[in-house]
From Swiss-Prot:
Primary localisation category: cytoplasm
Family matches, as Pfam families: Aminotran_1_2 (PF00155)
PROSITE patterns noted in UniProt: AA_TRANSFER_CLASS_1
Enzyme class at the top of the EC tree: transferase
Coiled coil: none
Cofactor(s) essential for the protein: pyridoxal 5'-phosphate
A GO cellular component entry from the record: cytoplasm
Modified residues (N6-(pyridoxal phosphate)lysine): 243
Source taxon at top rank: Bacteria
Protein name per Swiss-Prot or TrEMBL: Putative aspartate aminotransferase YhdR
Length: 393
């Protein structure tokens, strides 16, 4: 399809499309035609747990004050102080409000960070399978995304990372709990990564940043969140309240640096500058004011764990193979046939079951499904998953 007037890059990416968005649109079409209760949509990772009542009360009280003007680009001091306290407690590291930047979601945080550190032609390693937008975020600023496979257990392959590093490497995006697999990286695995990056810096003087993308960090069921700040000294944390507070549509995130980061003040100045010049200006003010009033910045994760447990039991009963998801709200089973796209198309056409092929995440042979859906949908999908697997057994 030729699209007149668009940039070549955008035209090419529009023609490629996104499997997640395609399935989102297909789901809307099927629901309109057959009714919502007849479509089993596991395609989109949308939080299902409502924000805490304390957040809603804080939002109402702040709305009544009617303060909606511009604020400083870095974000409200009270919100940054709350985030610094939150991060310091979680990671047992030294964070301060001066080294926090409030952003438009974690996506905004990553774009601000990448714009600040990546020169055209420099490389950023992404660990496959990966969140599809990573590649586009990197390319937004003339960078090159370098795909490096995780192990078969979806852990960091340290030797593969070593082989992926070149003199042009500027960063590596680290995501745990992991989208799309639901795995949670161990402290040793991240320690080994940190040791590798420190070895390279000591030998060559090369600066490589770890961009720690952790929006699912409050949704961990069977493990503890590893601490990259104890493993490496050049960590840029990018996160959001989308899942922590169940406010994905409100687009409130942040960047955080701990006291060990060299040139932290210079980086923060760059982040604030890019927050403005990329057009974000400042993160949503009402959301910042509400967060600043919160005592606990998390939802109850038990509803997600209940759904996780039910979903994996159904998949096991049907015969699917997968790594147990220990965080987030995704499962990443193996496709029973080599062509996972054909498998997902079959699921949609025969069963009105929407699941995402792994080719949308930079690898083949799997599919992703989200258990952040109504629990009745999971229960009612049991016979469908059993029948779907039998179609290819």
């Amino acid at each position: 399809m030729k699209l007149a007037g668009l940039s070549r890059e955008v035209e090419e990416n529009l023609n490629k499309g996104s499997w997640i968005r395609k399935l989102f649109d297909e789901g809307a079409r099927l629901k309109k035609e057959f009714g919502e209760d007849q479509v089993f949509d596991f395609s989109l990772g949308n939080p299902i747990v409502e924000p805490p009542e304390a957040f809603k009360r804080a939002l109402i009280e702040e709305a009544e004050k009617g303060s909606h003007g511009y604020i400083q680009n870095q974000g409200l001091l009270a919100a940054r102080e709350k985030v610094a306290q939150f991060l310091g407690s979680r990671f047992e590291a030294d964070f301060s409000a001066e080294r926090i930047v409030m952003t438009v979601g974690a996506g905004g945080a990553l774009n601000v960070a990448l714009k600040s550190i990546v020169n055209p032609g420099e490389e950023v390693i992404i660990l496959a399978p990966y969140f599809a937008e990573y590649k586009l975020y990197i390319e937004n600023y003339g960078g090159k995304a370098v795909s490096c496979p995780l192990t078969s257990r979806f852990e960091i392959d340290i030797e593969a990372v070593r082989q992926s590093i070149t003199p042009q490497t500027k960063g590596l995006i680290l995501n745990t709990p992991h989208n799309p697999t639901g795995t949670v990286l161990s402290q040793k695995n991240i320690d080994d990564l940190g040791a590798l990056l420190k070895e390279i810096e000591e030998k060559s003087g090369q600066t490589i940043y770890v961009l720690f993308d952790e929006p699912y960090s409050q949704l961990i069921y069977d493990e503890e969140l590893a601490n990259p700040f104890q493993s490496y000294h050049r960590v840029i944390l990018a996160s959001s309240f989308s899942k922590d507070l169940g406010i994905a549509g409100e687009r409130l995130g942040y960047i955080g640096l701990d006291s060990r980061m060299p040139d932290a003040d210079l980086l923060i100045n760059a982040f604030v500058y890019c927050n403005r010049t990329l057009g974000f200006v400042n993160a949503p003010v009402m959301m910042q004011r509400a967060v600043a009033r919160m005592d606990d910045l998390r939802v109850d994760a038990s509803a997600y764990k209940e759904r996780r447990d039910l979903m994996v039991d159904i998949l096991k009963e049907a015969g699917f193979e997968f790594e147990m998801p220990k965080g987030g709200f995704f499962v990443f089973p193996k496709s029973p046939i080599e062509d996972e796209v054909a498998f997902c198309v079959h699921a949609a056409q025969k069963y009105k079951l929407l699941i995402v092929p792994s080719s949308g995440f930079g690898m083949s042979g799997h599919f992703r499904l989200s258990f952040s859906v109504p629990i009745e949908q999971i229960k009612n999908s049991r016979d469908i998953f059993i029948s779907l697997y039998k179609d290819f057994a």
